[in-house]
């Protein structure tokens, strides 16, 4: 479904004091979600973990602005937004995070577009530079081929997969899983969600 353009989206995010100024300094209390969309999952994580800080990275202001309703619902003071493309993150963020989430990124299914996938080696280098030692990269996707590509890419580029499942909602970690808006849609259609955790070694 095409994202509806909201002309004043960036202004509305700024007015809520959610937009970070770059370069933004972080430390190991920070958790980052790349491609947060409407922010449902990360805002719930922020509410559940008030002693940690959360940064939602989203390329499109018209998607990110939707997170405002969750900020108000949970009265969050530990959640912020960065409007950025993933490839620019090392210029936008200074410091190292505890965890990076990749939630349902575009799988770019055509072979000629493989370098655009967020688990391609160039992006994995960025995440490695943004994570503390033993920091965790977490991936959720409904696309099996993309998941398999991601597993191979991680293994080939210095990462160790510490957990993986092809059925997140019937797995050991499901009890702590928070669904994204996109995830809820696919679960209702009985799609299986693939999930992994990895560290850079």
Swiss-Prot record:
Q: Does the keyword tRNA processing apply?
A: yes
A single Pfam family, by name? Answer: Methyltransf_4
Recorded GO MF terms: tRNA (guanine(46)-N7)-methyltransferase activity
Residues reported in the UniProt entry to bind substrate? 110, 142, 180-183
Keywords attached to this entry? Methyltransferase, S-adenosyl-L-methionine, Transferase, tRNA processing
Q: Please name the pathway.
A: tRNA modification; N(7)-methylguanine-tRNA biosynthesis
Q: Which Gene3D superfamilies match?
A: Vaccinia Virus protein VP39
Q: Which family does it belong to?
A: Belongs to the class I-like SAM-binding methyltransferase superfamily. TrmB family.
What does the record give as the function of this protein?
A: Catalyzes the formation of N(7)-methylguanine at position 46 (m7G46) in tRNA.
* Xref: PANTHER family: 3-DEOXY-D-MANNO-OCTULOSONIC-ACID TRANSFERASE/TRNA GUANINE-N 7 - -METHYLTRANSFERASE, PENTACOTRIPEPTIDE-REPEAT REGION OF PRORP DOMAIN-CONTAINING PROTEIN
Task: Report the protein name in the record.
Answer: tRNA (guanine-N(7)-)-methyltransferase
Q: Which organism is it from?
A: Mesomycoplasma hyopneumoniae (strain 7448) (Mycoplasma hyopneumoniae)
Task: Name the gene for this chain.
Answer: trmB
